[in-house]
Amino acid sequence: MKRERINQIAALVDKRGVITLVQLREFFPKVSEMTLRRDLFQLEEEGRLIRVRGGAKSMKDLQKTSGVPYAKNTNLHATEKRTIGAKAAELIDKGASVFIDGGTTALYFAKEMPDVPCTVFTTGIAVAQELAKKENVTIHLLGGILKKDNLSTVTSVAPAYFHEINFETAIISASAFTTESGFSCDSMMEAEQLKLLRSKAKFTYMMLDSSKIGKVMPYTFANVEDINVLITDQEFPESLKTLFKSKNIVVM
């Protein structure tokens, strides 16, 4: 019975592209909202949809607009990314000037970010699309070469573009982290761009889920001492939390 309902929900989401909990209650009047929320959570864990505020969005729709690699990456460790994104979103205040990268964790941040008057600079196409739903957020999308794996842009003209621009906060996510190599990514141009954007910010918040620990990418863009706040999940090792805290870094 449960599996049949879950499959029906998945089919509805694929057919409509997006569906709200209110609409699901109309289709399943005898099922509680809490149960429907759990069904959506299970479907997201199975990689069949993406939960959004108040409902869910079709993976097929995301693949059409965002590319298959990005759609798959978005659902890897989705629970951890959602938790981290929500924590980071709580730190955004009215009037803030923020840079947010284009990683899949950043998409969850964008979904949870409050709709308050602020200015957001981003290299993420999907991030900008999500933020565009918020009436009070001013969005600056940096152009350049598109990285299809995370739908973010990189460009050699970033220094000129950001020459006279400063941020209160840079919110960055890493593809890999070790204590020896720091935070790293797979693109030299992206690494140089992230170093620049870090330098333009008063505070740097790093979003890092525990699955990235122990991985090394070719290009380091930040070391432990370069960040102010680490935002992570419950599985993050206590020994590493102690290391970050010993360097006066806030761990969330």
Could you tell me what each predicted segment is?
Residues 94-98, 115-119, 226-229:
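Short active-site oxyanion
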Residues 102-104:
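Short, well-ordered beta-to-alpha junction loops that form the rim of enzyme active sites
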Residues 2-7, 15-23, 27-30, 34-35, ...:
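HTH-adjacent hinge/linker in prokaryotic transcriptional regulators
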Residues 71-75, 116-117, 183-187:
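Short glycine-enriched, charge-decorated loop/helix-capping segments at active-site entrances
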Residues 20-22, 31, 126-252:
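Conserved phosphate- and dinucleotide-binding cores of soluble alpha/beta proteins
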Residues 111-112, 120, 124-127:
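Catalytic core of membrane glycerolipid acyltransferases/transacylases, capturing the structured
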Residues 1-2, 252:
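Absolute protein N-terminus
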